[in-house]
Each structure stands twice: as C-alpha cells, then as structure tokens.
Amino acid sequence: MSKKIKAIGFFVTAILVFAFACEPEMLYGTAKVAGSTPAGTNYEYGYSVCIDVTVDDQGKIIKVSDDEKNTEASIAADVIGAAASNKAYWKKYLSGKGFEKYKNLTIEDVKKMNVGFPGAPGVDAVGGATAASLAVKNAVLQALVLDASIKKLVNYKNPDNYKKGEQNKLEKIIKEGRAHLETLETYEEIEKALAELKQKLDALKTK
C-alpha cells in the first residue's frame, strides 16, 4: 500500500472519529409535577413531565422536546381525576414556548433559572404554568446530572493504579453505583449519591 493511500486512510479515520465524538447525544429526563403555595412542596398534580434533552459534545443543550408526547400520555393516565385541567396547563406551557428557554444552556445555567414555585412564579416560568415550568426544569436537570454523574463515576479512578483485588472492588462499586444512580428521581439525590460513591472509591488502596 502506498504512503499516499495510507495517509488518505488515516485522514478518513480521523474525520470519522471526530464526527462521532461531536455527534449530539439525547438524554431522557422525568419529574413529577408538584408543589403548591397553599398545600406545600409535597402536593402532586398526578402526572409527570417526560422529556428528551439533546446536548452537544460540550454538554450544552441543543434542544428540549417531548416529540413522543410522553407527558400527554402521563396526563391521560389521570391518576387523580384531573386530566382536563392538567392538559390545559401543559398546553399553556407548550404554547408559551417553555422548551425554548433551555437552548444553549449548561447544567449550571439551568440550576440558576428562576422558575419560582407554583403560586409564586419566577421570571423564567411560563405564565400560568409555573408547576409545569418547575417540573420541566427538574426533569432537564435530572437528565443532565445523571449523565454527567455516570461519566464522572466511571472515569473517577484509573483501574491501573490498583492491585487486582482492589480493582474488583472498584468495578463492583462503579457497576452497582451506576445502577443505583439510574433509579433516583431528582438531581439532588443523584448528586448526593455520587458524592457518597466517590468516598467509597477514595477509600480503596492504590498500589
């Protein structure tokens, strides 16, 4: 094989690797629609928002969507007999272009968003749909924080720095920890669990 052909082959491979690395990633997030000024934080409206979050290779949001209408399906399940009003508020959120507020934001940007609380809307809430606004923010954060936390957990330690016995413990903590993170409902729970898992990994003895 000529040097020219080899060079072309390496160039094409490099392009493919770069393109794959820069390909957008779609994450999934969900959060219960909850909270009421008179009833408190534990009040639930009987449905969950279920959204997709597309991010670029830097973790910046490209798009938040619910193209499969999973939230509407959750509303239709009508576990508390409030489907009609829930559907109206969700429609108001969508018509208020709530998803567009997340374009180009990072995890930290989303955390800083002020959607307020049902009954006391913030500047980033969709008017008349504060509960939905809060739930979407929580769902977006759940998706982003879960993805980031799993990546941090997997890459937190280098297995080559441990003897075989400790390597096995490392792999076990990561495997079980990842499974646990995926069961958690809120981004706060995920962040707390990741910190605890890091402590377990820090306790392992290196070579």
Regions found by a protein language model. Name each.
Residues 149-207:
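Beta-rich interaction/scaffold domains
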